[in-house]
């Protein structure tokens, strides 16, 4: 009986770690700490250019982080909410900046680095703010951020660029010029630019002369660009947006399939880590899907089970009590993968894989 139990435990371990047919998946991941790496802070204040007054920009919640490498350190750009109102989506979001040598212990900048301002984009950004960043880097060191502008009317996927992760230039709505303006009022978010792994560096890659970006919340779509600023959604023969993957009934992603961190071109294909929401439990868990690198709209494989689920207290207690591990930041550092995620819309966590 003891021998049977040992064999059964080994089988369950292999299944849980993504062995067998899922060797293409990135991971497995483990949590290096039972505490969040970034949490709300009531001491940090910022002169809001829209309100004309000091606000505690990191007071309420810190979550949904991007990640990048700069000067050998891990940098995390996270969504931070003030306390201007109550309820999910009703505060103002700004993007904060943190830096770490080990990926766990963070030094956080005193002020946000991307936020609503009295600029050409205030109609997109205000009053909801700048949300849910994803960051990827070009081979020549330009950082490209895809983020959601939220004016509390229509969420739009927007672009910003930087050479140092601190000073950002906004470029506006990614699909503004696509399709002769047919997408001008389209609600959209969550852009995952396709990258390649070169040593420990993830850099943006071109495919047949164009950049690729998986995007979407209700379903995963694909867009192309020649300059990383102006993007065009891909459509089918009827002119409708592509639905490369969609929610699956009865699974962890039965309600939503929302793109996570920048996708990674590996020897097996293009791996997209995404966020799945359950229609039954409403929890957010993390999944992975493999696309054909020669035909990036073609799905080769997809995990049936999530590889990261809400387990720790701070992943299940906060604004979103149904539980959330919302993955948005992925970097390679000193031979390890660091995956950063939002926890219950309130904290930032990290998981690590060799």
Predicted regions and their residues:
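Short Gly/charged-rich anion-binding patches and loops
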Residues: 258
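C-terminal structured domain segments
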Residues: 322-323, 327
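Positively charged n-region of N-terminal signal peptides that target proteins for export
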Residues: 1-4
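Bacterial N-terminal signal peptides
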Residues: 7-15
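General helical structural elements
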Residues: 6-7, 83
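Beta-rich carbohydrate-recognition and catalytic domains
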Residues: 17-128, 136-255, 264-320, 334-354
């Amino acid at each position: 009986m003891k021998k049977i139990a040992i064999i059964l435990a080994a089988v369950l371990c292999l299944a849980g770690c993504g062995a067998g047919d899922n060797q293409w998946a990135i991971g497995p991941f483990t949590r290096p700490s039972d505490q969040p790496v970034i949490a709300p802070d009531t001491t940090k204040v910022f002169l809001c250019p829209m309100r004309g007054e000091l606000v505690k920009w990191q007071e309420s919640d810190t979550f949904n982080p991007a990640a990048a490498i700069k000067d050998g350190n891990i940098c995390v750009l996270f969504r931070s909410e003030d306390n201007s109102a109550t309820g999910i989506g009703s505060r103002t979001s700004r993007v904060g900046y943190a830096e770490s040598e080990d990926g766990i212990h963070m030094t956080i900048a005193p002020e946000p680095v991307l936020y609503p301002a009295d600029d050409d984009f205030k109609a997109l950004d205000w009053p909801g703010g700048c949300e849910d960043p994803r960051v990827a880097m070009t081979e020549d060191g330009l950082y490209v951020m895809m983020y959601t502008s939220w004016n509390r009317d229509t969420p739009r996927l927007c672009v910003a660029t930087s050479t140092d992760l601190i000073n950002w230039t906004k470029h506006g709505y990614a699909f503004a010029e696509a399709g002769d303006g047919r997408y001008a009022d389209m609600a959209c978010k969550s852009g995952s630019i396709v990258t390649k792994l070169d040593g420990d560096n993830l850099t943006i890659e071109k495919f047949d002369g164009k950049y690729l970006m998986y995007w979407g919340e209700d379903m995963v779509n694909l867009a192309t660009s020649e300059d990383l600023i102006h993007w065009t959604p891909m459509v089918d023969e009827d002119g409708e947006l592509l639905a490369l993957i969609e929610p699956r009934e009865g699974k962890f992603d039965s309600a939503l399939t929302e793109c996570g961190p920048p996708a990674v071109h590996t020897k097996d294909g293009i791996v997209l880590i995404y966020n799945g929401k359950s229609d039954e439990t409403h929890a957010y868990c993390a999944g992975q899907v493999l696309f054909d690198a020669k035909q990036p709209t073609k799905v080769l494989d997809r995990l049936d089970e999530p590889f990261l689920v809400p387990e720790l207290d701070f992943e299940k207690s906060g604004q979103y009590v149904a539980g959330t591990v919302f993955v948005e930041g992925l970097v390679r550092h000193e031979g390890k993968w660091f995956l950063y995620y939002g926890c219950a819309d309130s904290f930032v966590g990290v998981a690590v894989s060799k």
